Regions:
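Residue-level signal for secondary-structure boundary sites
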Residues: 14-16, 60-62, 99
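A compositional/biophysical signature of low hydrophobicity enriched in polar/charged and small residues
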Residues: 10, 85, 98-99
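Short, low-order "capping/linker" segments at domain edges
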Residues: 92-104
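Short acidic/glycine-enriched loop/turn segments that link adjacent beta-strands
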Residues: 45-48
Length: 104
């Protein structure tokens, strides 16, 4: 299992606009939305971060979804609006080595 984290460092005070654009993109199926995906925001640390956390069984599955997303009709137009709210971004790809919790 791999966890892909798309981390967006937003411009100060632009969280609400960015969240509205994310909601719009999800409604219009412009973004990757594998089962058990999460949208996170900071509670501590550097402020104005928006994090998309995407679980994938394989990196090949992630690459296939990413290719599909980038070719989605309307994605480029949406992204042009979204990136105006972003100061910087980064991507983390993590390998899950064990699952913790009651249901393991």
């Amino acid at each position: 299992m791999f966890i892909v984290r798309e981390i967006f460092h937003l411009q100060f005070g632009r969280y609400r606009e960015a969240k509205q654009l994310l909601d719009e993109a999800m409604k219009n199926q412009l973004l990757l939305q594998p089962q058990e995906s999460r949208i996170l925001t900071d509670f501590s640390g550097e402020g104005y971060r928006l994090i998309l956390e995407l679980p994938y069984e394989t990196l090949a599955a992630y690459e296939a979804d990413l290719k599909k997303e980038l070719n989605e009709t309307g994605w480029k137009e949406w992204y042009e609006k979204f990136k105006q709210l972003v100061r910087s971004s980064e991507r983390e790809i993590l390998k899950q080595v064990t699952k913790m919790g009651k249901n393991t």
